[in-house]
């Protein structure tokens, strides 16, 4: 037996495409590509990354370990990964006007956990928007580390209009004197008053942390208030409205907090950063600095408002009465259908959405009375306001027919064909991977 691998073995290892090496995985990827090509994606937390972002993410950088920060690594051979990480950092700081940035968090949840570690100790009090009112798990929800490691106090929204109850938030802050006040959400469609959060944080001696995961792209385009100048720490994902690879980021203008953040990310939470993902982030941040990206975000906002208006005109109850962002929360009770059922029916018609609790929801969390809709992904493929109004019509027809046993299947099948025809007018990737 030769001590060396054969040349044919090496050629296959370094050059053979996925379909030759693993047909089973290749088939799954191609079927997912078909699903994305032929379906309308309305999940507000999803988007479509550019092919350039995916190419960077599927690069040789996946081979490289790089624990530490640029210029201060625990491994050799980091000259090129240092360059790409510094590029990502510099671009990110330019986008949001931040003094310091960490691009290493593997996810938004990791970014939030690192921010909590930098700002507080286990047992400290944290004040965040409740999950039931549109907050995120990582903002103090009981099942999450943020609700287990910290004394979590939750504010909510007003029953009469679904808007954040700032008076309640301020009263709770004065009563509990939290170490951190969290502003941000996963299902809140309106602009957040960061100045009011900053004022009460200063009054009670709290840090202000803003999670802008959902609206970061709109901030980058100047269409949503920038929280970075007012927050002690700002976190975000990179794959929602920022339209990049899946991952997280942390921003601050405070040099002392920057050091704490860096230590919290590594060695506090993570080992080696995912350098191939950081390369994808660098590409996405470069795109976010372009005029095209700003125009895209304007369409994201206009399209969300068009969809909300169309659904409202068709008898749907839009929580808060509209949207200031990419996101719409729909109360389905006037249509007498649950979020769980609506999600399943829409998926059969080629429209992907997610069931979502509405404020003061009487249904269980896995059933819900609402659905959450978002415009980023369909806007990325080219849909405009007219197409989003068509989507609103399709949603109405399918969900209305769902209550008519004799007609539901035929309507769903017809709308599914309309969905595929609409999607073919706005094609996306022609292959599943770079």
Curated annotation (Swiss-Prot):
Subcellular locations according to the entry: Cytoplasm
Residues binding (6S)-5,6,7,8-tetrahydrofolate: 131, 135-137
Keywords, alphabetical: Amino-acid biosynthesis, Cytoplasm, One-carbon metabolism, Pyridoxal phosphate, Transferase
Pathway field: One-carbon metabolism; tetrahydrofolate interconversion; Amino-acid biosynthesis; glycine biosynthesis; glycine from L-serine: step 1/1
Enzyme class per UniProt: transferase
GO biological process: glycine biosynthetic process from serine; tetrahydrofolate interconversion
Matching InterPro entries: PyrdxlP-dep_Trfase, PyrdxlP-dep_Trfase_major, PyrdxlP-dep_Trfase_small, Ser_HO-MeTrfase, Ser_HO-MeTrfase-like, Ser_HO-MeTrfase_PLP_BS, SHMT-like_dom
GO molecular function, one term: pyridoxal phosphate binding
GO CC annotation terms, alphabetical: cytosol
Catalytic reactions on record: (6R)-5,10-methylene-5,6,7,8-tetrahydrofolate + glycine + H2O = (6S)-5,6,7,8-tetrahydrofolate + L-serine
Site (Plays an important role in substrate specificity): 239
N6-(pyridoxal phosphate)lysine PTM positions: 240
PROSITE patterns per record: SHMT (PS00096)
Entry keyword DNA repair: no
Reported function: Catalyzes the reversible interconversion of serine and glycine with tetrahydrofolate (THF) serving as the one-carbon carrier. This reaction serves as the major source of one-carbon groups required for the biosynthesis of purines, thymidylate, methionine, and other important biomolecules. Also exhibits THF-independent aldolase activity toward beta-hydroxyamino acids, producing glycine and aldehydes, via a retro-aldol mechanism.
Family: Belongs to the SHMT family.
Subunit organization: Homodimer.
Name used for this protein in its record: Serine hydroxymethyltransferase
Organism: Gluconobacter oxydans (strain 621H) (Gluconobacter suboxydans)
Name of the gene encoding the protein in the UniProt record: glyA
């Amino acid at each position: 037996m030769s001590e060396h691998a054969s040349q044919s073995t090496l050629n296959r290892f370094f050059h053979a495409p996925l379909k030759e090496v693993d047909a089973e995985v290749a088939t799954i990827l191609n079927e997912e590509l078909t699903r994305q090509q032929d379906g309308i994606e309305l999940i507000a937390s999803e988007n479509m990354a550019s092919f350039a972002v995916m190419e960077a993410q599927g690069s040789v950088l996946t081979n490289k370990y790089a624990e530490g920060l640029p210029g201060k690594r625990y491994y050799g051979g980091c000259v090129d990964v240092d360059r790409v990480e510094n590029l990502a950092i510099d671009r990110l700081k330019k986008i949001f006007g931040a003094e310091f940035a960490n691009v290493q968090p593997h996810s938004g949840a990791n970014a939030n956990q690192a921010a909590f570690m930098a700002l507080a100790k286990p047992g400290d009090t944290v004040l965040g928007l409740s999950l039931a009112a549109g907050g995120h798990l990582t903002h103090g929800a009981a099942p999450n580390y943020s609700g287990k490691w910290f004394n979590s106090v939750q504010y909510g929204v007003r029953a009469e209009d679904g808007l954040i109850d700032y008076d309640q938030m301020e009263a709770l802050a004065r009563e509990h004197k939290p170490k951190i006040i969290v502003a941000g959400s996963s299902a809140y469609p309106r602009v957040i008053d960061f100045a009011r959060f900053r004022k009460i944080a200063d009054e009670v001696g709290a840090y202000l942390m803003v999670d802008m995961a959902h609206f970061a792209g709109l901030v980058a385009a100047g269409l949503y208030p920038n929280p970075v100048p007012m927050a002690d720490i700002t976190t975000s994902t990179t794959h929602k409205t920022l339209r990049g690879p899946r991952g997280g980021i942390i921003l601050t203008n405070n040099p002392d907090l920057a050091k704490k953040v860096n230590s919290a990310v590594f060695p506090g939470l993570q080992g080696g950063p995912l350098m191939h993902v950081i390369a994808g982030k660098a590409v996405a941040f470069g795109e976010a600095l372009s005029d095209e990206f700003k125009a895209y975000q304007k369409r994201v906002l206009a399209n969300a408002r068009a969809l909300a208006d169309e659904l409202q005109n068709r008898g749907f109850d839009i929580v808060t009465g509209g949207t200031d962002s990419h996101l719409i929360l729909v109360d389905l009770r006037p249509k007498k259908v649950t979020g769980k059922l609506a999600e399943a029916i829409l998926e059969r018609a080629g429209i992907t959405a997610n069931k979502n609790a509405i404020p003061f929801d009487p249904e269980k969390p896995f059933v819900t009375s609402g659905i959450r809709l978002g415009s980023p992904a369909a806007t990325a493929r080219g849909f405009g306001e007219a197409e989003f109004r068509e989507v609103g019509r399709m949603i109405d027809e399918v969900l209305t027919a769902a209550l008519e046993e004799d007609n539901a299947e035929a309507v769903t099948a017809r709308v599914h064909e309309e969905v595929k025809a609409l999607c073919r007018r706005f094609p996306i990737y022609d292959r599943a991977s770079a």
